[in-house]
Amino acid sequence: MEDSTSPKVTLYTYFRSSCSARLRIALNLKSIPYTPIAVNLLKGEQSSPENIALNPSGTVPTLIVEHDSKEPVTITQSLAALEYLEEITPASSHALLPPASNPEARAVVRTLVDIMSCDVQPVTNLRILKRVAPFGVDRAAWSKDLIEDGFRAYEAIAAKSAGLFSVGDSITMADVCLLPAVWGAERAGVKVEKFPTIYRVAQRLEEEDAVKRAHWRTQPDTPEEFRVSSS
């Protein structure tokens, strides 16, 4: 986006939210400045009247894009926000999808995105873990098993499609969704190195400045005991 037409972007986020991290990474890759507003999930701030008014799902992230000549755009689902950012940014920005001339590669990217965002994240997020706890479910084992199931599927596809990253040699939407899932997997005790393509791609992604600035350990709301410098 050109500076003269750049909208004001606000991201309601939580430092450890994988869905929020997707947008932090994407915004950084596309060099889109944004203002982060922290929503503390552990304190239940996502269920506050103020957050519900912005995000009826009572979740994060919420992306608000304010254009000079248009009504503000509010997007409350991370994948919809990623697609929106892809559509409003020029070709000269970092594209998160392969070119339209390669629909096959775009389909692979979207398949990998769906594995992380539909198969893994919804059943391992904090809200679901709280719901299953009264049934005596081992939350750690639940998360670990379901993450590993998703990683096996991702690995099988990415092993064929990967170059430097999950699909070819450019960072795509698949990688933007993969790395936050890897952070969550490590927290759940998954040995990510069991999935060699995922592990290799994640290691390379961690070297990117856009990723370092989006990392859960470098956010304004990251507690001091977890904080590291993004430099």
Swiss-Prot record:
Top EC class of this enzyme: isomerase
EC number(s) stated in the UniProt entry for this protein: 5.2.1.2
Protein's name in the database: Maleylacetoacetate isomerase maiA
Function text: Maleylacetoacetate isomerase; part of the L-tyrosine degradation gene cluster that mediates the biosynthesis of the brownish pigment pyomelanin as an alternative melanin. The 4-hydroxyphenylpyruvate dioxygenase hppD catalyzes the conversion of 4-hydroxyphenylpyruvate to homogentisic acid (HGA). The protein hmgX is crucial for this conversion and thus, probably functions as an accessory factor to mediate specific activity of hppD. The homogentisate 1,2-dioxygenase hmgA is then involved in the cleavage of the aromatic ring of HGA and its conversion to 4-maleylacetoacetate.
Assigned GO CC terms: mitochondrion
Taxonomic path: Eukaryota, Fungi, Dikarya, Ascomycota, Pezizomycotina
GST N-terminal domain boundaries: 7-93
UniProt keyword annotation of Isomerase present: yes
Family under the similarity heading: Belongs to the GST superfamily. Zeta family.
Pathway connected to this protein: Amino-acid degradation; L-phenylalanine degradation; acetoacetate and fumarate from L-phenylalanine: step 5/6
Induction: Expression is positively regulated by the cluster-specific transcription factor hmgR.
Listed CDD domains: GST_C_Zeta, GST_N_Zeta
Gene name for this UniProt entry: maiA
Catalysed transformations (reactions): 4-maleylacetoacetate = 4-fumarylacetoacetate
Pfam family, one: GST_C
Molecular function, one GO term: maleylacetoacetate isomerase activity
GO BP annotations listed: glutathione metabolic process; L-phenylalanine catabolic process
UniProt keyword list: Isomerase
